[in-house]
């Protein structure tokens, strides 16, 4: 009949990658909040770019702010305390992380984003977070609800990656996180998700 049945081992040897487009609330253009959780190097950025209709969302990514501030520091006289830092150096990554945190960028930019939100066309927002602690969500949720976002349109997605793969990803990406921070971010995400 020309059709042959694969043995179980042959079946396992065939490596199928099934990719799915994630459409929150059937792909609505407004009013969706996504908390995208996952440890450092887990592939959250890859998931956003390839599986999540990025064009429909404002993406809040602390790493993008770090890069922007470093570029400003390196090309202007602003922020001399971070001038010349490298995202490939884990110590520098910690310094720039502290710099952004101390400036209150996350809070200020969220306040600006939500300041003039119209409930009918509130922007879709992805929060790219490690979720190493539940405060990653708990700190912003009241502001989102106050702005008029409907709780049924607030989603939590966990990008779960084998830790060994995340370590390899960390070594080859543009921003390298210290080993202890890597472990804490993955343990914290797992604890928060469970």
Describe the residue ranges of each PLM region.
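Short acidic, low-complexity intrinsically disordered linear motifs used
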Residues: 2-15
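Pre-Walker A adenine-sensing motif
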Residues: 16-27
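Short hydrophobic/aromatic beta-strand immediately N-terminal to the Walker A/P-loop
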Residues: 34-35
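The Walker A (P-loop) glycine that initiates the GxxxxGKT/S ATP-binding motif of P-loop NTPases
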Residues: 38
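Conserved glycine(s) of the Walker
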Residues: 41-43
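Conserved substrate/cofactor phosphate-moiety recognition/catalytic segment
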Residues: 48-123, 135
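Conserved phosphate-donor/acceptor-positioning beta-strand/loop module used by diverse small-molecule
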Residues: 132, 149-168
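Conserved GTP-binding G-domain of TRAFAC-class P-loop NTPases and closely related GTPase folds
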Residues: 162-194
């Amino acid at each position: 009949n020309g059709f042959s049945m694969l043995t179980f081992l042959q079946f396992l040897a065939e490596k199928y990658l099934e990719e799915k487009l994630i459409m929150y609330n059937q792909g609505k253009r407004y009013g969706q909040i996504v908390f995208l959780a996952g440890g450092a190097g887990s592939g959250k950025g890859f998931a956003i770019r390839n599986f999540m209709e990025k064009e429909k969302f404002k993406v809040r990514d602390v790493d993008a702010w770090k890069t922007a501030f470093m570029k400003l520091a390196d090309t202007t006289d602003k922020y001399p305390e971070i001038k010349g830092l490298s995202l490939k150096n884990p110590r520098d990554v910690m310094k720039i992380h502290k710099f952004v945190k101390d400036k209150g960028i996350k809070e200020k930019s969220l306040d600006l984003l939500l300041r003039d939100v119209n409930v009918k066309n509130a922007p879709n927002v992805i929060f790219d977070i490690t979720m190493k602690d539940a405060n990653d969500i708990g700190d912003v949720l009241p502001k989102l609800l106050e702005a008029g976002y409907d709780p049924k349109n607030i989603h939590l997605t966990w990008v779960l990656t084998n830790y060994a793969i995340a370590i390899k990803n960390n070594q080859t990406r543009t921003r390298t996180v210290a080993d202890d921070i890597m472990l804490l971010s993955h343990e914290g995400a797992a604890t928060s998700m469970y």
